[in-house]
């Protein structure tokens, strides 16, 4: 896909700290004022950019999945993906000012389309039965290393949650897998005036369970409480006829939320909400209580 109008536009490259691992040697940069370019400088990272190009091309086939970025140019020699810039704000920054039900209805519309059987079949024809990839912390790592960040009592709770998550996720999954985005957090969404404009960054997309997709919706930074999660689950069931398991979502969430705290703390990076590991444990305990999940 060629776009000669892009020639000569300045590229603004962001700071690239913390990308010593070849897997992460890719970046997104502004191309002029109206475009965004995705590129990589290692073979490992290039596979993710190429994967996203193929996924977006497949998802744009009618009936297209809503809220996709507009691909302006894509190529493999050199490997590059250019999309049209969409004005707006991360969900993380606006979630407190958006009605939970209104936001959930839009998110469920995107998820219902992405998770459809038709999209899964198209994806398997393009990329094969590739599982979604994201480096979630293992429960073993959380048991062994999280205790250095919190009190003994808090680590006891973390250990119980890990045991519970292992037990829940070991149960046979009764439904076919779907194509999941794989990394659907607030910064991968652009919102404007309470309306979802676009969902970004499909390089982790692959087969998985819908509950895995929603592992970040309980928080942190998704607003107080778990209303966005429960409203999204409700609208998702209305659109798809498929009720999601809140236990499986929260089992994935244990690994997601605590794993994020672990790697940020060990890397010397502030937590996403700029609070402490102990506060993150308290927040997770509150979410579990609000969802009536009692882990002994």
Annotate each predicted stretch with a short phrase:
Residues 76-78, 193-195, 254-257:
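Short strand-connecting beta-turns/loops that link adjacent beta-strands
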Residues 46, 177-179, 185-186, 190-244:
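Active-site Asp-x-Gly
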Residues 42, 82-97, 116-119, 139-147, ...:
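A glycine-centered beta->alpha junction motif in the catalytic cores
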């Amino acid at each position: 896909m060629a776009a000669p109008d892009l020639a000569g536009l300045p590229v603004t490259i962001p700071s690239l700290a913390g990308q010593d691992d070849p897997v992460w040697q890719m970046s997104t940069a502004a191309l002029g004022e109206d475009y965004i370019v995705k590129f990589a400088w290692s073979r490992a990272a290039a596979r993710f950019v190429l994967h996203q190009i193929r996924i977006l091309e497949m998802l744009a086939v009618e009936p297209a999945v809503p809220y996709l970025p507009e691909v302006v140019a894509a190529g493999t020699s050199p490997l590059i993906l250019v999309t049209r810039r969409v004005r707006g704000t991360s969900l993380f920054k606006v979630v407190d000012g958006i009605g939970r039900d209104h936001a959930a209805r839009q998110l469920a519309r995107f998820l219902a389309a992405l998770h459809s059987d038709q999209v899964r079949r198209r994806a398997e024809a393009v990329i094969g039965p590739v599982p979604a990839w994201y480096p979630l912390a293992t429960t073993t790592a959380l048991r062994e290393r999280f205790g250095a960040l919190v009190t003994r009592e808090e680590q006891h709770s973390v250990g119980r949650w890990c045991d519970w998550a292992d037990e829940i996720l070991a149960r046979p999954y009764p439904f076919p897998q779907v194509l999941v985005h794989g990394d659907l957090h607030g910064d991968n969404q652009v919102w404007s005036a309470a309306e979802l404009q676009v969902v970004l960054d499909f390089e982790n997309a692959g087969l998985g369970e819908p509950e895995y997709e929603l592992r970040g919706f309980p928080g942190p930074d998704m607003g107080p409480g778990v209303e966005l999660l429960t409203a999204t689950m409700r609208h998702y069931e209305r659109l798809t006829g498929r009720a999601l398991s809140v236990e499986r979502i929260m089992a994935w969430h244990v690994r997601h939320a605590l794993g994020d705290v672990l790697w940020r703390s060990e890397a010397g990076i502030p937590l996403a909400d700029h609070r402490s590991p102990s506060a993150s444990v308290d927040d997770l305990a509150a979410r579990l209580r609000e969802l009536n999940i009692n882990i002994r």
